[in-house]
Amino acid sequence: MRKVQIYDTTLRDGSQGESISFSLEDKLHIVRKLDELGVDYIEGGWPGSNNKDLELFQQTQRVTLQHARMAAFGSTRHPRYQADSDPNLNALVEANTPVVTIFGKSWDLHVKTALGITLDENLDLIRESVAFLKSRGKEVIYDAEHYFDGFKADLDYALATLKAAEEAGAHTIVLCDTNGGTLTSDIQERFVRASRHVSTPLGIHTHNDSEMGVANAIVAVQAGAMQVQGTINGYGERCGNANLCSVIANIELKLGMSSIGKENLRQLTEVSHYISELANLLPRTDQAYVGKSAFAHKGGIHVSAVMKETAAYEHIDPALVGNARRVLVSELSGRSNILYKAAERGLKIDKSSAAAKIVVDKLKEMEHYGYQFEGAEASFEVLFDRLVHETKDLFELDGFRVITEKKGAGEPYSEAVIKLRVDGAEEHTAAEGSGPVSALDRALRKSLTTFFPCIRNVRLTDYKVRVLNSEGGTNAKVRVLIESSDGQESWGTVGVSENLIEASWQALVDSITYKLKKEHGPRKKGSPADKATASEPRPGRKEAVGSQHS
């Protein structure tokens, strides 16, 4: 089986992406994670340009890598220096990495305008730089910057630069689509021409400015590339680099070649999300292979087909890349969605039962009103129990009042007063918070903790508001998504109303109800302890606490 080397440049090219800044500690964590994934090369940075990268190379000397080889990055020598006195080349040697990657000019435009030298002088820079690094015992990877644009402008000269690197002893020559503007047909033609001109193993380095980064990398592999350079999640300058998550999966699962191996491939989703976290960026849900939505199904017909044969709407088994199938509940849902989602959460229902139709109809009614259960699956489970098992909540709300007050130049504060009943016992509680929702959340938990100590550890960890009809101005309908956690599990709930506090209350009630259900089990209607309920299933909760707040 043909092996394709994976060269990761997340720490150098990836960190040039907007809003990305890895700390030294972040970079060390990423090095270890990439090594575990099984990539062949990890480009740590440019030691000649900043102290952080130089320190990284010093730190990685103490890290035992199981698979990957560290690479330092730089350029060919400066025209005014000889190779042995060039500060950049000497910094590469002093980085003490087994591999050094340098880039040189392949496009005559850059030679004449950026470097301001003759074409022959540029060939000397390439030869002498590669030869110098080789003489210091380095594995030298030569990146032919702007090769594809250079080929278009002057193919003979572009090929001559490759020959210069080969003659000096480069181990690998990487053809770079630095501007990211080349189409796949041109990538293939120009790659093949290069492979006929030099015998050194060739690699590919593509950018995504034309949304072709991954496609161009794969075309080059099919044309014979032995190495692919890219970044995890496609991070990089401008529109980013070739996304290695997609490249690796395509090599392993589509081309029948080897890169990191099938076993390591199962780590791909985890590594993608891990590096997103360190980059302080939200993972792209629609990212191929590793995104949360990559194997998410919403349409009822699709879900029905997937339940019978996964290949009907999935091009691979999600588990192969460490991902998982998801079925979404929405107004597009049919009974198949409900059955799958119910089974996924350990809930039982017969497809042909009247209850299944009731759930589907209620969901469609609520989604039409503005509810959305993607990311609020705890609300779905609470609703399911109310409709199918006819459960009641463990507490009944008599009413609440929320007041926000500001005095002078001081910070505003909010106070919530709640009156509710648990098994007939009345609880009247007040709490303050930094805002009305915070106060309401604290008051609700404070009033219930005496009866249900298990909610003492429940915390609101995320709160999102979306305006559903902005043309309504201050009377617009809003959807509130809340994420809660007890330290062991996290769950999401939803509420919708023209009143922000009411929408928040709905989501808070579902959050507490979900936790109590997990701890105490559902309460059926008519049970001895069944005195009342907090709120019934709602078509937008039109009946819910309209007069219970001010």
PLM features per residue range, with description:
Residues 3-4, 10, 249, 255-425, ...:
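A mid-to-C-terminal "edge-of-domain" accessory segment
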Residues 4-6, 16-41, 59-63, 78-200, ...:
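Alpha/beta enzyme core
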Residues 66-73:
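A glycine-rich helix N-cap at a beta->alpha junction
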Residues 175, 229-237, 252-261, 321-328, ...:
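Short beta-alpha connecting loops at secondary-structure transitions
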Residues 179-182, 188-308:
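Catalytic alpha/beta core domains of metabolic enzymes, predominantly
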Residues 432-437, 443-444, 480, 484-486, ...:
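Terminal-proximal interaction/regulatory segments of ATP-powered molecular machines
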Residues 451-485:
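Generic long, charged, amphipathic alpha-helical segments
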Residues 487-524:
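Mixed-charge, glycine-accented linear interaction segment located at domain edges/termini
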